Amino acid sequence: MKKKICVSAVCFAMYAASCMGQVVQNDGFAQLCEVYRHATMTLNKVKTVDESGSALDSLALLLRNNKDNPAILQVLRWSYDTCPKEKRGAYEMALREQAEMKDAIKRLAMSGALQSEKIGTAVNQFAKTFAIRDLVYDERVGNEGAPAETKKARDKRMKWWRDGKFGMFIHYGLYSGLAGEFQGKQYEGCVEWIQMQSGADFETYKKEAIPRFNPKSGKAAEWVKLAKEAGCSYTVLTSRHHEGFNMFETPSYSFNVKQLKGIDVVKEYSEACKKYDMKAGYYFSLLDWNHPDYDPSGSGISYPAGNYIAQQQGKREFGHHDRYKKYLSDIFGVLLDNYKVDLVWWDFSQPKFQGDYAWGATHLMKQLFDKYPNAIQNNRLYHSDNHLSEGGIKVTPVWKGDYSTAEHHIPAKGIDGDWEACQTLNGTWGYSASNQRWKTVKELVHELVDVVSRGGNFLLNIGPMPDGSIPKESVALFKGIGKWMKENGEAIYETRANPFDVEFPWGRVTRKGDNTLYLLIYQLPESGKISIPCKFKGKAVATMLKNKQKVALSQSEKECVINLSGMPMDEVATVVKLKGKWESLIQ
C-alpha cells in the first residue's frame, strides 16, 4: 500500500507540474480546479501518517519549486489547510520554512504578480465554488505599495471596520456654498459636481463659489457628535473633492480652506473624532478639475467644459501629469503628517485611467501604510472591466484595496469579500437648498439592515450647509436612526451576514457566532408567525430584543417557527433574538 501511494504521489506531482504551464499561461479557473481536485483526491486516498508523508512530499515539492506562481501557491496552501491534521506530515514541515515563504510572498507583492486580474478573479471564483470560506485570497497582497499580510493579520486590522457596520459620510467643500445654484440656475442631482454640470472654467467658478462658502469653527464637532448619537462607528469627511479645493492647509498650493477662509476644517474634524472616540476616515479625490498640472486628455475622466475652452484659447495650460502625480503625493503626505488617519476613501478611476499610470497608486499606498500600517483603504485607486456586475451596477474587485464600494446601490446578494454601500438621505451628496426629497427613518433603517444582513457596511451621507451647519432634516433622520440603534444595535454591531442564502418576505437575518441569530422584522404576517430554515441542537430561547420578553418557539423537520401574535411591534423594525446552537436546513 505504501509503495502504491508513493506512485500515486509521484503521478500527482507529474500531473500538477504539467498543469502548471497551463495555469501560468491562462491563470484559469478550470486549471485551478483541476490541480485542487487532484491534490485532495491524492490526500483522501492515504490511510496512514507515513503514507500521507509521501503524498504530501510531492505537494511540498510543488510548493517549493513554484512559489513564484501566485495561483499555484494559493491552491497548494488550500490543499494543505483542507487536509486532516493527522495527515499533514512533510507538507507541514515544508510550510514551516518561514523565511522561504515570506521571501516568496514579498517577491510576489513587489513584482505585482498578484495584480493580475485573471489570477485574482480565478482564485476568488475558485474559493467561492469550493466554499472555502475561512481561506480567502489575501486581498492586500498584490496591492502595490501595501505590505503582504497573513489572513490572521488582515482579520485583526479589519476587525473594527467589520464590527462597526455603520458610518457617516460628510460631503463638505466649496460646492456647499453654492447650495445647488450657479449663476441663477438651479441644478439637480449630485450638486457637488456643479462645476462640471455648469461647465464653468476655474476663474468663473472661484468668483462665484468662494464668497458664498462660509465655514464656521465648531461645526465639525457637531457632525461627529451627531454621528455618535446615531450609533456610527466611523466617519468619512471629504478632505478634497473633484474641484480640487483642499479642506486642510496645503502650504504648497493656495487653493485651500485655511488660506482662503482662515479655518482648517480637517483639523477641527480630526480633533472632534478624537474627542468622541470616532474612527476618522478621509475621502480623497484623485481628480482635480482645476489644478494647473491636471491633464485629463485621453483619459475618459470628466472635465469642466470651460477649462477645455480656456486651454484651447491659450488661457490655460494643458497639464503635466507627472507633476500632478507628485502634487497628489505631496498633499496626501500633508494629510498623513498632520492628522490621524484610520481610513482612506479614494475616488476615482476609470478603465483607461487608474493605478500607477493615473495616480501613482504604488507610492500613495506606500505613504499610507508606512505612516499608518493598520489603516484601511477602499478599492478606488483602481478600476477594472473584469468586475462584478448586477443590474448594470459595476463594482471594482476587492482584491485591489481592502473593500469594495457600492455607490447609491445595495447589491441584492451582497458582494464577495468586504464591502460597503454608501447612500444619501435625499439623492445628493453635497448640500442642495431646493432638494427636499428626504427619505424616512424607516427607509434608512431598512437600508442599513439590508446591507448588514448581506455582509456589508453602511455609509450614510450628510451634506452640511455653507457655514457647516447640518440641515435640520438630516439631524432628525440621524437621531431617528440613533433611537432605533440604541434599542436594537446588538443585532447590527459585530454581526455577520444572513447564513441562509435566502431572504424572507417578513424581513432580514443577521448572526453572531454560531449560537445567536437576530430576526429583523419589517412586516409581520397576518398569522403572527415567521419561520426560518434551521433547527436547534438542544435548548433554544427566543426573546424580543427591545424588552427581553420571551417568545414562543417551535421546531419541525423543515423549519423553526416563531409566534409573535400579540407582541408589540416596532413601527421601524422589530428584532427577535434566537439563542442556541443552530444548524441550517438548507441543502
Residue ranges and their predicted role:
Residues 1-23:
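Bacterial Sec-dependent N-terminal signal peptides
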Residues 33, 70-78:
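Amphipathic alpha-helical repeat scaffolds of TPR domains
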Residues 41-52, 64-67, 85-90, 109-118:
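Charged, low-complexity interaction regions
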Residues 55, 71-72, 100-101:
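Structural recognition of alpha-solenoid helical scaffolds
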